[in-house]
């Protein structure tokens, strides 16, 4: 019974709870719905207000933009109106200027028409006067011919001959004046440049000879050098191609030969043999071979050193070897290697004074005597041989031409070629640079005087300054001042054609006029 009552109570409580819950849920739901409706209504109202605000702002912005666009359009229109007004004003001014110019042209055209008419009238008057003058000239010519007894052709010829003689005399005088002025200016400038070059480069070297002397520790060494029945000296001469002269000279052996390279090889080999003490044919051949290698190395180093000292780079190795061989070549007892260096330095100094390429000038000066390094088997002058070698080993045409032209084998047509000629003359022609045999020297003086006296009008001639100047005394009755200038050039050309000489020779023609009168 109690259980049933409990169940009934539980069921009643559950029903009551369900009822109360439904009532509460319904009330809460109604409250939430009303709040949601209020919130939605509020959101809608806010959205409407915001939309109205945005719409108003957009309308205001649009109105503002329209206003600004109108204002900008008005400004543009105003500026365009101003530009158009300015353009219209300029066009009006141009039109006025054109009108003025047209009026001016019309005026000038009228003036030119008047001038043309005046010139035409004047021309007609001149034609008439010319006809009258021609008639008068013909009449006067007939009178002159009848008076002088000469035809017009003969008179014209006499006049032309007189004018030609006078013109030649004036031309000769003018040429003399111009040449003197040019010579004074050129001599002064060239002397300044050459003097500066010589002062800035003062090279020193000892002239080579055709013999070398090897010192011996004692005269007993001479017998060892000769060997049994002369076998050592024969082996040494055969290996080197040099003659050994063993005479009464104390403690010395003389090496004689015209090939300086072979002579140097023989000298080095003999010195090594003397130092070593073992002297026999087998040892001689071995030492000579080593000496040849040493000389070849010396030649290569000499070529490299020359290029380094001058600051000239990019020269072919074969050319450098030939330059090194010049160390063992001489010309009139002047060492060609030192001469080439001297010419290169002088060329560079003069080139810097003249404002031309210094490196190129030094290169041409160094290579100008390249042909002298080649043995006699190659035919041709050393200038031609040197130019061919330079061309073969890739030197520029300017360098090749300078080498070819330095002894007039080709006419010099560049400043560089003339510079090399001048530097070569400076190095070779200065006193003491070169020597020649007494017989050659005397013959050269005789040839100079013979060539000078072979010309008409020459009374006497004297070779002075060791044959570097020839003074020619001419007759004042046969040779005029103008003719003396031409005579000096003719003598110089004949000397160049018939003689061989180092440097240059000055031809000095002297004409003396003496006026004698006696006071009584």
UniProtKB/Swiss-Prot annotation:
CDD domains: HDc, KH-I_RNaseY. Its main location: membrane. It comes from the Bacteria. GO terms for molecular function: RNA binding; RNA endonuclease activity. GO terms for biological process: mRNA catabolic process. Residues 336-429 form the HD domain. The chain crosses the membrane at residues 3-23. Residues 210-273 form the KH domain. The keyword Hydrolase applies. Keywords: Cell membrane, Endonuclease, Hydrolase, Membrane, Nuclease, RNA-binding, Transmembrane, Transmembrane helix. It is a single-pass membrane protein. It is an enzyme of class 3 (hydrolase). Its EC number is 3.1.-.-. GO terms for cellular component: plasma membrane. InterPro entries: HD/PDEase_dom (IPR003607), HD_domain (IPR006674), HDIG_dom (IPR006675), KH_dom (IPR004087), KH_dom_type_1 (IPR004088), KH_dom_type_1_sf (IPR036612), Ribonuclease_Y (IPR017705), RNase_Y_N (IPR022711). The keyword Isomerase does not apply. Pfam families: HD (PF01966), KH_1 (PF00013), RNase_Y_N (PF12072). It is found in: Cell membrane. Endoribonuclease that initiates mRNA decay. Belongs to the RNase Y family. PANTHER family: RIBONUCLEASE Y. This is Ribonuclease Y. It comes from Geobacter metallireducens (strain ATCC 53774 / DSM 7210 / GS-15). The lineage of its organism: Bacteria, Pseudomonadati, Thermodesulfobacteriota, Desulfuromonadia, Geobacterales.
């Amino acid at each position: 019974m109690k259980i049933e009552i409990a169940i009934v109570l539980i069921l009643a409580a559950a029903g009551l709870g369900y009822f109360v819950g439904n009532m509460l849920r319904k009330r809460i739901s109604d409250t939430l719905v009303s709040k949601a409706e209020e919130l939605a209504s509020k959101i809608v109202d806010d959205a409407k207000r915001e939309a109205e605000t945005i719409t108003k702002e957009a309308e205001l912005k649009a109105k503002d933009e329209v206003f600004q666009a109108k204002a900008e359009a008005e400004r543009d229109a105003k500026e365009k109106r101003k530009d158009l007004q300015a353009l219209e004003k300029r066009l009006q001014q141009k039109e006025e200027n054109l009108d003025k110019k047209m009026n001016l042209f019309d005026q000038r055209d009228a003036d030119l028409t008047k001038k043309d008419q005046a010139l035409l009238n004047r021309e007609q008057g001149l034609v008439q006067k010319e006809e009258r003058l021609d008639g008068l000239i013909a009449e006067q010519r007939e009178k002159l011919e009848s008076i002088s007894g000469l035809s017009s052709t003969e008179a014209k010829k006499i006049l032309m001959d007189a004018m030609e003689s006078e013109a030649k005399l004036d031309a000769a005088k003018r040429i003399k004046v111009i040449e003197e002025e040019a010579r004074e200016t050129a001599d002064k400038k060239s002397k300044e440049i050459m003097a500066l070059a010589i002062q800035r480069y003062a090279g020193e070297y000892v002239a080579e000879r055709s013999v070398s002397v090897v010192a011996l520790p004692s005269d007993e060494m001479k017998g060892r050098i000769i060997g049994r029945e002369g076998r050592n000296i024969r082996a040494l001469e055969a290996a080197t191609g040099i003659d050994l002269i063993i005479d009464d000279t104390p403690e010395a052996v003389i090496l004689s030969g015209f090939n300086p390279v072979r002579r140097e090889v023989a000298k080095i080999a003999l010195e090594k043999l003397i130092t070593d003490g073992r002297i026999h044919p087998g040892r001689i051949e071995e030492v000579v071979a080593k000496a040849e290698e040493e000389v070849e190395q010396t030649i290569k180093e000499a070529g490299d050193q020359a290029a380094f000292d001058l600051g000239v780079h990019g020269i072919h190795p074969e050319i450098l070897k030939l330059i090194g061989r010049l160390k063992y070549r001489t010309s009139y007892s002047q060492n060609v290697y030192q001469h080439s260096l001297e010419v290169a330095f002088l060329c560079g100094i003069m080139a810097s004074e003249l404002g031309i390429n210094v490196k190129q000038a030094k290169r041409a000066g160094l290579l100008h005597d390249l042909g002298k390094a080649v043995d006699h088997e190659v035919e041709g002058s050393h200038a031609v041989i040197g130019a061919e070698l330079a061309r073969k080993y890739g030197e520029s045409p300017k360098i090749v031409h300078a080498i070819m032209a330095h002894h007039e084998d080709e006419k010099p047509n560049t400043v560089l070629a003339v510079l090399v000629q001048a530097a070569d003359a400076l190095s070779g022609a200065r006193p003491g640079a070169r020597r020649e045999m007494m017989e050659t020297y005397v013959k050269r003086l005789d040839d100079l005087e013979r060539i000078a006296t072979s010309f008409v009008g020459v009374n006497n001639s004297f070779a002075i300054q060791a044959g570097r100047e020839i003074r020619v005394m001419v007759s004042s009755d046969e040779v005029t001042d103008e003719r003396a200038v031409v005579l000096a050039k003719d003598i110089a050309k004949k000397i160049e054609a018939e003689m061989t000489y180092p440097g240059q020779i000055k031809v000095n023609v002297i004409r003396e006029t003496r006026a004698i009168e006696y006071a009584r």
